[in-house]
Amino acid sequence: MSNFSPREIVSELDRFIIGQKDAKRAVAIALRNRWRRQQLEGQMREEVMPKNILMIGPTGVGKTEISRRLAKLAGAPFVKVEATKFTEVGYVGRDVEQIIRDLVEIAITLVREKRREDVKAKAHLNAEERVLDALVGKTASPATRDSFRKKLRNGEMDDKEIEIEVSDSGASPNFEIPGMPGANIGVLNISDMLGKAMGGRTKTRKTTVKDSYPILINDESDKLLDQDQIVQEALRVSEDEGIVFIDEIDKIAAREGGSGAGVSREGVQRDLLPLVEGTTVATKYGPVKTDHILFITSGAFHVSKPSDLLPELQGRLPIRVELSALTREDFRRILTETEASLIKQYIALMETEEVKLEFSDDAIDALADIAVDLNATVENIGARRLQTVMEKVLDEISFTAPDKAGATFIIDAAYVKEKIGGLAKNTDLSRFIL
């Protein structure tokens, strides 16, 4: 587990997300508290629970991005779900325990990737031997193998086609089993059991020497890994480091005087309660305790209010953070200051066609102005509006770029207004196009 200080976490998030200092501080403290808990011993370590977070703010201001970047920074298993996708237990639809099962699957992938890195050197040597077997046969003399090995390492054999045998991990079909706690168990993994009994199924693949290496390295890595250890480690990582982001929690808040779907909405909240408070969820890999999983919830709360959530659920989300709507200056900074800003992305994309894009300062001002105006007059979708505006401005250049290799386009305020000014003024049209 990474031991970044809260200040380091915030400065890392600043590289990708503009503004929203309060939200960044809240998640930074939550992540640091996890590290602090890991340093504790015995009973006290069990007693310290994570302080779950409720983010309140309009769409497109960075709620999801903050959580996603945080999980990446921590190297923790992260799952994002929308509260509206779930139904009360007993109704048709996904139940909330599926969130934890998805988290475990993601943790297994993470742990396996880390373990593969540890054995990569050994796996690479084994893969090389298998490529040699395919090229010269298993019975070839050591001298022949050595001469071919030299050619292999010099890249002389890269384009030669070979046939390789790789283990067939053909996905066994998964079935939802009604009333079973570990649903999605699959056909009780009969194919897995048979595979182990018969030494594993293999299939033959035809590929070039160069392309065979990644496949064989993965195959050899998996042979060197202990799957049971990976599962145990993944279960531990899910319990101690997992982060669950539940979006649109405001949509399941019962509005005052509401009726109809309110029953199911409240039911989803009641099902979330034990998950957020701490319960044990059955998965096909084993039970997972949710006591120390960090839950970050978010919602715009345009129609409902946080106080419309069940009081018990409100109590389990002790940290409230309000994210502010984006200003014109924020839009300017999003276009220019973030690590992979939209402008940098478009410049890089056009470079692949040998077309050079240059944006003047007044063009950036014009883009920010149009995005702010559209958010105010049409619908406030936050930073996502910039993508729509940029696509419209660069539509012509993107379309004709393959025929304009070597050209340089200078995007200034006049160009932006020419491409988009009329549409932005015509509110009726911009409702549909921007």
UniProtKB/Swiss-Prot annotation:
Entry annotated with the keyword Nucleotide-binding: yes
InterPro entries given in the database record: AAA+_ATPase, ATP-dep_Clp_protease_ClpX, ATPase_AAA_core, Clp_ATPase_C, HslU, P-loop_NTPase
Main location: cytoplasm
Disulphide-bonded residues: none
Subcellular location: Cytoplasm
Secretion signal, residue range per the UniProt entry: none
Annotated binding of ATP, by residue: I18, G60, V61, G62, K63, T64, E65, D247, E312, R384
Gene3D superfamilies tied to this protein: 1.10.8.60, DNA helicase RuvA subunit, C-terminal domain, P-loop containing nucleotide triphosphate hydrolases
Subunit structure: A double ring-shaped homohexamer of HslV is capped on each side by a ring-shaped HslU homohexamer. The assembly of the HslU/HslV complex is dependent on binding of ATP.
UniProt-listed HAMAP family: HslU
Family indicated by similarity: Belongs to the ClpX chaperone family. HslU subfamily.
Protein name per UniProt: ATP-dependent protease ATPase subunit HslU
Organism: Brucella suis (strain ATCC 23445 / NCTC 10510)
Recorded name of the encoding gene: hslU
